[in-house]
Amino acid sequence: MEGKEDKQQQHKIEDAGILYVTEKEEFKHEKKPGKSIQHSKPCVGRGRVYYAKFINTNVRTCNEPVPYIDVKKEPENQGDWWPHGKGLENPFQPPYDTKSTQRSDFKKPTCPLVSPVKHSKLQKPSYGIVPLVSPDASAELQRNFKEHISFIHQYDARKTPNEPIRGKRHGVFVQTEIKPGSRPTVPERTEVLLNASGSCSSEQSKKTEKGNSAESKMISPGLCRQNSQELLETKTHLSETDIRVAANASLRRPEKREKTAKVFQIAVVNALLTRHDPLSPPIKSQDKSG
């Protein structure tokens, strides 16, 4: 124990000697005015540094020394930062309008409107951002054009004009002019059927009159009634193919119409004869039997 106390006293004496030496050196510097240390002047706008150290307990920087400086707290002069005087009394305010800058283009200008040279003088000049459509377009002009969607068929990309015309691409609305002679003039279906049935019935009536006059003695009156009723039924129940033939015949030339009408009549007569052949042999009249 005595040894430890002696060591502590020696350390205190050494520390006191170091402090005594440092105090003497400071007095020497003060006595020599030529070798006085020149301290740096503090910067304008900054406080004077009165405390500085290194922070060694920062885990974020792996305990590397980080300098820390603290400045004396003095009233800051904020007059250099921005002026505290009064602002402008009458600031300029630009005109404010809810309309856009291009909205005035839709109004009719005061100056006279002039159309390009290539257009006719009768055409009214347009004004505005987008040219306006003239509402005076007649309905007859619209009827002469047929609007449809274009589709390209058998397109060959190996040709030299690879890209087709822009108006003929897929899905483009194209207007084709309808020529006056190309419009089909199709008669109504009722007229075709009436003409076909009327011509057939007239010729059939002539043939039946001749046949009846020649075979009046061979056929009984009961069979004639049955044949007349069956003829009426067959006229009403004509097949669809015969109707189509008659409709197509009316659209062709007059010479072909006559030929098709004759063929149609012959076909109807043959069908009637095959359907209405008498199962029993013809009954002879009593005059010839006697």
UniProtKB/Swiss-Prot annotation:
Region (Disordered): 76-112, 197-228
Any matching Pfam family: CMIP6
Keywords, sorted A to Z: Cell projection
Keyword Lipid biosynthesis among UniProt keywords: no
Residues covered by region (Mn 2): 213-246
InterPro entries registered for this protein in UniProt: CMIP6
Superkingdom as given in the UniProt entry: Eukaryota
Compartment list: Cell projection, Cilium
Cysteines paired by S-S bonds: none
GO cellular component annotations of the record: cilium
Spans annotated as Mn 1: 128-160
PANTHER family linked: RIKEN CDNA 4930505A04 GENE, SIMILAR TO HYPOTHETICAL PROTEIN FLJ40298
Name assigned to this protein: Ciliary microtubule inner protein 6
Organism the protein comes from: Bos taurus
